Amino acid sequence: MLKMGVVLFTFLVLFPLATLQLDADQPVERYAENKQGLNPDESREIILSALRQRDCCEQGWCDGGCDCCQ
């Protein structure tokens, strides 16, 4: 009888808790409302400005493929 109680407890309590996705398990959607309404030109400008902030190649190794070397 004890074994059946343990099995019932496992399947009725622990199994649903392990399979439920709680709010903490969901990825954060930061500023999703602000970025969905942008037109393609505005979103392209945001992406390009973020790419410009990256470190560029060194002057000796520059092949002219990045904007900051010009």
Swiss-Prot record:
SS bond partners: C56-C68, C57-C66, C62-C69
Where does the record locate the signal sequence feature?
A: 1-24
- What does the tissue specificity note say? Expressed by the venom duct.
* Keyword entries, A-Z: Disulfide bond, Secreted, Signal, Toxin
Q: Which GO terms describe its cellular component?
A: extracellular region
Asked if the keyword Secreted belongs to this entry, the reply reads: yes
Gene Ontology terms, MF aspect: ion channel inhibitor activity; toxin activity
UniProt key word Secreted: yes
Pfam families for the chain: Conotoxin
Q: Where in the cell is it found?
A: Secreted
Superkingdom of origin organism = Eukaryota
Write out the propeptide range(s).
25-54
Instruction: Relay the domain remarks.
Output: The cysteine framework is III (CC-C-C-CC). Classified in the M-1 branch, since 1 residue stands between the fourth and the fifth cysteine residues.
Which family does the UniProt entry place this protein in?
Belongs to the conotoxin M superfamily.
Would you tell me the protein name for this molecule?
Answer: Conotoxin TsMLKM-02
Native species of this protein? Conus tessulatus (Tessellate cone)
